[in-house]
Curated annotation (Swiss-Prot):
The record marks 219, 447 as: Important for acidic pH-dependent nucleoside transporter activity. Acts as a pH sensor. It comes from Mus musculus (Mouse). Residues 73-105, 156-162, 221-230, 327-340, 399-415, 472-475 are extracellular. One of its GO terms (molecular function) is neurotransmitter transmembrane transporter activity. A truncated version of SLC29A3/mENT3 in which the N-terminal 36 amino acids are deleted, enables cell-surface localization of an otherwise intracellular transporter, and is utilized to investigate the transporter activity. Pfam families: Nucleoside_tran (PF01733). The keyword Cell membrane applies. GO terms for biological process: adenosine transport; cytidine transport; dopamine transport; guanine transmembrane transport; inosine transport; norepinephrine transport; nucleobase transport; nucleoside transmembrane transport. This is Equilibrative nucleoside transporter 3. InterPro entries: Eqnu_transpt. Expressed in macrophages. It catalyses: adenosine(in) = adenosine(out); guanosine(in) = guanosine(out); inosine(in) = inosine(out); uridine(out) = uridine(in). Disruption phenotype: Knockout mice show lysosomal nucleoside buildup, elevated intralysosomal pH, altered macrophage function, and develop spontaneous and progressive macrophage-dominated histiocytosis. Contains a N-terminal dileucine motif (DE)XXXL(LI) important for endosomal/lysosomal and mitochondrial subcellular localization.
Length: 475
């Protein structure tokens, strides 16, 4: 019995099956975790006891983005270190002020460009290096970089500010590269699991941002010395990275996880040449090593994910364009009143905490609601509508500004509302896009497709951060 054509094939956790001809019906079925999870012949599907795998993936999601979030949210620390530490009020030369004013943009570019390159590398390594090697190695590198940053917290860098800046950018590039390998490897792993596990991982990423924002606020409130608060900040990140290593090792011991992590035989239906019969080897059979392709077929994956890829690029372009380069430079209209809520805590509250919490809420909603579907024209329409948020943020009290002198929204409530809308839309729509991608291809291509989806995401982040860095000089 022949398989359906490529356009009508959907991926379950363990098999490929003929999708209904009606697109709306197909979308609904593709989103039902239970229906997508057909057990292979001869194997009984185990239950996720006590939601152990779900919790582990959620924690791994936190750990995957925690290093980046901790780097970005430590704004006061970077401002302190990039000035003359012993005399912050002294006159800096124009080059030092340029580094200080546009540091967030430099940091964003340093994180997105290496991320893009290492996503390509990870795509090539999918079938060459085992996933547990990639995960543990990337976590170890991130942990080592944070140890270096912890040591530098207490080092007086006032005599080599530019050298410290270069070292920080290099550390950010390494952190971004290792985090990319970790995130894409774990996200690819969830492609073989039911959809709820991918949702847990993606929601965990938003929780990582929320945790870092809360930790920053607590540190700022509890410590008068920015170095002490940052030391506690970075130590927390290092401890959690170590915890992630332990949790990942624990994951492979769960019966539920072992069931979905077992090897899969190659399926020829996706080659574009012919359609195999359903009598081909089942998904549970183990493929001989000599038959496993070293590099997944990129062309068919790009074809199947073209629409979702456009959505991913557009979504993250807008988000990276606004955060952190634009949003962190929006000041309270009442900054001069002397209140800490309109000065010291304004950016941590209205940008980092609010955005990450709204992002988390948007991602959690996808655990119960998954509309529009992967074939719906409404999905790209909603994504494109987010471009309207860019001018709204620019017309808030962004400082410094030399050319665009008009501040249209002269109330602090506007950046709060815009940030909520940005976070909710980013969380909900990006989660839908990322969990759809690996589910519209055969299971053995799920990990490679996950890497491709993250590649789309990184392209959007890189373009957004680069455009924001350019735009800042014209505002």
């Amino acid at each position: 019995m022949a398989f359906a054509s490529e356009d009508n094939v959907y991926h379950s956790s363990n098999a490929v099956y003929r999708a209904p001809s009606n697109h709306q019906e197909a979308d609904q079925e593709a989103l039902l975790g239970k229906l997508l999870d057909y057990p292979a012949p001869g194997l009984q599907r185990p239950e996720d006891r006590f939601n152990g795998a779900y919790i582990i993936f959620f924690c791994l999601g936190i750990g995957g983005l925690l290093p980046w979030n901790f780097f970005v949210t430590a704004k006061e620390y970077w401002a302190y270190k990039l000035r003359n530490c012993s005399s912050p009020a002294s006159g800096e030369d124009p080059e030092d002020m340029d580094i200080l004013n546009y540091f967030e943009s430099y940091l964003a570019v340093a994180s997105t460009v290496p991320s893009l390159l290492f996503l390509v590398a990870n795509f090539l390594l999918v079938n060459r290096v085992q996933v547990h090697v990639r995960v543990l190695a990337s976590l170890s590198v991130s942990l080592a970089i944070f140890v270096v940053m912890i040591v530098l917290v207490k080092v007086d860098t006032s005599s080599w500010t530019r050298g410290f800046f270069s070292l920080t950018i290099a550390c950010m590039a390494i952190i971004s590269s290792s985090s990319t390998i970790f995130n894409s490897s774990v996200y690819g792993l969830t492609g073989s699991f039911p959809m709820r596990n991918a949702q847990a991982l993606i929601s965990g990423g938003a929780m990582g941002g929320t945790v870092s924002a809360v930790a920053l606020l607590v540190d700022l409130a509890a410590s008068s010395d920015v170095r002490d608060s940052t030391l506690a900040f970075f130590l927390m990140a290092a401890v959690f990275l170590g915890l992630c290593m332990g949790l990942y090792l624990l994951l492979s011991q769960l019966e539920y996880a072992r069931y979905y992590m077992r090897p899969v035989a190659p399926v020829r239906v996706f080659s574009g040449e012919d359609n195999p019969s359903q009598d081909a080897p089942s998904a549970s059979s183990v493929a001989p090593a000599s038959r496993v392709m070293h590099t997944p077929p990129l062309g068919p994956i790009l074809k199947k994910t073209a629409s979702l890829g456009f959505c991913a690029v557009s979504l993250y372009f807008v988000t990276a364009f606004i955060i952190p380069a634009i949003s962190t430079n929006i000041q309270s209209m009442h900054k001069g009143t002397g209140s800490p809520w309109t000065s010291k805590f304004f950016v941590p509250l209205t940008v980092f905490l609010l955005f990450n919490f709204a992002d988390l809420c948007g991602r959690q909603v996808t655990a119960w609601i998954q509309v529009p579907g992967p074939r719906s024209k409404l999905l790209p329409g909603l994504v494109v509508s987010r471009f309207c948020l860019v001018p709204l943020f620019l017309l808030c009290n962004y400082q410094p500004r030399s050319h665009l002198t008009k501040v249209l929204f002269q109330s602090d409530i506007y950046p709060v509302l815009f940030t909520c809308l940005l976070g909710l839309s980013n969380g909900y729509l990006s989660t839908l896009v990322l969990i759809y991608g690996p589910k519209i291809v055969p299971r053995e291509l799920a990990e490679a497709t996950s890497v491709v989806m993250l590649f789309y995401m990184s392209v959007g982040l890189m373009l957004g951060s680069a455009c924001a860095a350019l735009l800042e000089h014209f505002i």
